[in-house]
């Protein structure tokens, strides 16, 4: 079932399978002989792992309702579209488990949010993450209050990367999320 769902999002699937859960190679996803013998069994093993079940349960409890986040992202995208005449009428948002590898990705024309990265600093799973990989200052940012700003920072880095620094991106993010009335009135 997971294999069938992920096939609809080939970029995310490749990232998830090969890099995030490190289950196998890219050709395992497209080679019919390897799908049945490698891919599906590895995905089943992953889904049935007791640790994964605990993490999935924690994600479900923390994010039992996600519509408010989608609404705020939609408003921000509308502001972005107004400022840049981008013609964005709808941002497709998806959520996934990143194996603690990614906060926000843009793959397959979808903005993907790794919910495991926002369980909260006080979450027992987050507390158990190794401090050499996840120092305390990083765990402090693993909070759902950062989802919206992380989505827009990632989106702006993808579409308006500035190698000279992120001051422009910070100004744009602030404008998209907090400007009222219209940003055009402010910047002409």
Where are these regions (language model features)?
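Acidic/histidine-rich, surface-exposed loop or edge segments in extracytoplasmic proteins
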Residues: 49-64
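N-terminal mature-domain "stem" immediately C-terminal to a signal peptide or N-terminal signal-anchor/transmembrane
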Residues: 1-41, 45
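Loop-centered beta-sheet repeat module
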Residues: 107-162
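Zn2+-dependent metallopeptidase catalytic core
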Residues: 68-87
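Acidic helix-start/capping segments at beta-turn-to-alpha-helix junctions
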Residues: 93-104
């Amino acid at each position: 079932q997971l294999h069938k769902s992920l096939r609809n999002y080939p970029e995310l699937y490749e990232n998830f399978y090969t890099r995030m859960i490190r289950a196998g190679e890219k050709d395992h996803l497209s080679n019919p002989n390897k799908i049945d013998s490698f891919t599906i069994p590895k995905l089943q093993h992953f889904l049935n792992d007791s640790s994964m079940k605990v993490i999935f349960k924690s994600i479900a409890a923390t994010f039992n309702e996600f519509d408010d986040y989608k609404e705020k992202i939609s408003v921000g995208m509308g502001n972005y579209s107004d400022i840049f005449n981008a013609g964005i009428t709808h941002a497709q948002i998806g959520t996934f488990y990143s194996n603690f590898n990614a906060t926000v990705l843009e793959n397959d024309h979808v903005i993907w949010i790794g919910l495991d990265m926002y369980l909260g600093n006080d979450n027992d799973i987050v507390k158990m993450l190794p401090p050499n990989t996840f120092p305390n200052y990083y765990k402090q940012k693993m909070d759902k209050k950062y989802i919206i700003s992380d989505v827009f920072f990632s989106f702006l880095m993808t579409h308006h990367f500035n190698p000279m620094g992120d001051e422009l991106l910070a100004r744009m993010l602030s404008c998209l999320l907090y400007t009222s009335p219209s940003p055009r009135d402010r910047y002409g």
